Every structure is written in structure tokens, then in C-alpha cells.
Amino acid sequence: MFAFYFLTACISLKGVFGVSPSYNGLGLTPQMGWDNWNTFACDVSEQLLLDTADRISDLGLKDMGYKYIILDDCWSSGRDSDGFLVADEQKFPNGMGHVADHLHNNSFLFGMYSSAGEYTCAGYPGSLGREEEDAQFFANNRVDYLKYDNCYNKGQFGTPEISYHRYKAMSDALNKTGRPIFYSLCNWGQDLTFYWGSGIANSWRMSGDITAEFTRPDSRCPCDGDEYDCKYAGFHCSIMNILNKAAPMGQNAGVGGWNDLDNLEVRVGNLTDDEEKAHFPMWAMVKSPLIIGADVNTLKPSSYSIYSQASVIAINQDPKGIPATRVWRYYVSDTDEYGQGEIQMWSGPLDNGDQVVALLNGGSVPRPMNTTLEEIFFDSNLGSKELTSTWDIYDLWANRVDNSTASAILGQNKTATGILYNATEQSYKDGLSKNDTRLFGQKIGSLSPNAILNTTVPAHGIAFYRLRPSA
């Protein structure tokens, strides 16, 4: 039996809350980078961060946009006699300023972590009630990014107003330092963060922590994918669980403030290649931050070629900054081993008049899937230009780096990295305006009015397209 869900505006308060421009001038596109938590947790050190940054640079990923190196929890040894945070000298013998300087000298940006609670999630000193001195500590150490968690919050949650003011205290403190610091809330979507986050932050988590599973339910992530207002977010949430929770929230994100679906799990667990190929572009098209959660020293060629797919990254970094919308969703009978099975179509506008389209197969078998211009341009009126024009179809995975080339790059063949897009030399915005072919995939056909876009999508896989007005 099929169940059909069409997008509604039943929870939209955009007219009330809106999506304002960046509150601090940062986050004009979703942030990209690397965070140690998903792979290394508390096993952190100065050497890990600097070696990882060097490897990201060598692989050409820094120049593709992965510039934030984010140090997560477990870096502190407490506070000094003046109440300021102190870095663990065993893990960071040269101090945080040394780490920041090394990263800055190599064109990276430095991120650190704290929690809006008495303690961090791993039990280290938190910043609740200490916002001004801790913000000054981060500024003094030339930090460019703060991930701000939600553990040990002393019960200061339960309404949007309570959570808003708890997180605004750090926002104000960061601004007071005078240093531009990207502010990333990690409050798990508690108290409807997507309604109020854009006024005080550049991104906000909208669910419990991710795990490297495509559909597997977990009792530690108690809310299913339809519960966007989850009272207990938990953790070990699957990719599809988080994606479905995010579906109604795109209307409350945009330039300067982004829904954060959590770090990328490409090469973190045992996802299949098709699952990784679906995970990455779905995060990209809903304009989630693209934060690598893997050990970059153990990337497989197939995973590397996903992280380095410029035509997908260009969707995420599109200057229009509008998250894609889930247009339809069906449950299907061919469920997987966890009893999960559904198919979806997502669509969204891009800056240059193009449109991004995804056909997502969450079922257990490959299946034919299709869509039409009426579905793709779901907000257009009958007879509008979008519905009466012919569109060229570009497959955004068609020019994926092959395993041989990826292996050469991973083996530090500097010549091989020359094929990669370099966003340091030419921004994605400029590359799109100049029609750089690396950002558009490969043309595979056209879609005329009243025609149907047909394709076969693998199990737990995706068909991912950019539509361009036909010449």
C-alpha cells in the first residue's frame, strides 16, 4: 500500500520569522570543512589537526572549499585562576594560538567547540554563564568558528524563548570581541531552532546526532522522520531519518543562516557507494554544511571522488542559497531489512535560472522513477515559462572522478589534482557564471513540456540532475 505526502505550508511561519541576511556577515554559503568528532571523538591533538589540514590541502580538498578545520570536544584541561579556559598541554603543547597560526598560514580557518551548559558533552568545562570570558578566549586564540553544543544545560530549555536567550548570550559575546567568528549552534533542533536561529547564528543543528546508517532505526533516536519538532532528539539518527525531519525546514534557512543536518558520513561507517552518493547530494541540495566526518588519511578512492565532486558542491554553494523542497514522497512495499522503504522527489531553484532535481530511492530494489516539469516547478502557474520551455538535463554524477585517478591523488600524485575544480582561484559563483563545465555534469538529454523524465534509480540511491534552459 502506498502513502502519498505532498509538500504543505502547514508549519510555515516565514511571514512572521522570515530568513534575514547574515547577522554577522558570515555564512553567505553553507560552511565546508572537517570536524574530528565522528571518527576520533576525544582522541584529539595538535598533531591530528595539523596533519589533517596538510592532508586536506594535498588532496586538493581545501581548494574545493573545505577550509574550516574544527576541533570538537575534549581539548580543555579546565580553567585558570582568572576563570579563562586552558588548553590541555599534553594534547596541545604549543597552545591554540599556534594551531590557529599554522592553519591561517596555510589558508585554512580554525574552529573550536564549547557547550551552552555547565559542562561540555564529554564533561569538560562549559560556557553557560561564562560567555564573555570564553568568547574572548576564542578571539584571543584567533578562532574563526565556534561549534556550540547543548549538554548539561541546567534545564534551560522547553520553549523557543528560553533556548533563544541561552544561545544569544554567546552570540552577543562573540560579536563583542570584534573578531568575525562563524557561530554554529549544536542544540539538536530543540525548541524549534529553525525559527529563531538566523537572528543570532550562521547555522543550527536541526536533529539529533547522525550515525553512519542509511535507514536503520535506533531507540537512541526516538523520533521518526516525520517529527520535526522532536522533544528528545537523541543520537544515532540515520541519514533518511534526518533528511525527512529536515524536509519542512528549508523555508526557514537561506543566505547567512543554514539548517545543519550534521557531519557527512561518507567513509565513516559501512555505507554502500550508492548510499554515499545519495547522502552527499541530499545534504548539498538542502544547503546543509558540508563537513567531512571521516579520517582523510583512510579515504577510499570511491569516497574521495564523492567529497571532490564539484558539480554537486556547486549546488550547495549556489549563491541564491535556497534549499531544495521535497515535492513528493511515497512509501513502497519493497522495504529493506529494517522495514524501511520510500521514494521521494526533491527540487529547488538555482541562481542562474537552473533547477536542481533529485529522485531518491529509499526502497530495497532498483526501480524506475520519473517526474515531470509540473512536479519540478511545483510553484509555477499553468502556462508559465518554466512549464512551457524545454530544459536540458545534466547528470551531476556523470563526470565523477574515476577510481584510478582518485587512487593517484590519494597516492599524492600532484599532477592528478590538476583536474579538480579550484574554488580558491575561481569561486563557485564565478565558475557558474562562466559556465565552467566541471560544475554542470554531463548533458544526457532534454525535457520538453508534457514529457516525462524517466530513469532507473538503484536501491538506497539517487538520480541527481541540473536542469538548464535549452538553447
Swiss-Prot record:
One Pfam family in the UniProt entry: Melibiase_C
Organism equals Saccharomyces cerevisiae (Baker's yeast)
What is the E.C. number? Answer: 3.2.1.22
- A single GO molecular function term of this UniProt record: alpha-galactosidase activity
InterPro entries, sorted: Aldolase_TIM (IPR013785), Glyco_hydro_27 (IPR002241), Glyco_hydro_27/36_CS (IPR000111), Glyco_hydro_b (IPR013780), Glyco_hydro_melibiase (IPR006215), Glycoside_hydrolase_SF (IPR017853), Melibiase_C (IPR041233)
- Which residues of this chain are annotated as glycosylation sites? 105, 175, 270, 370, 403, 413, 422, 435, 454
Official protein name in the record: Alpha-galactosidase 2
Oligomeric and partner information: Homotetramer.
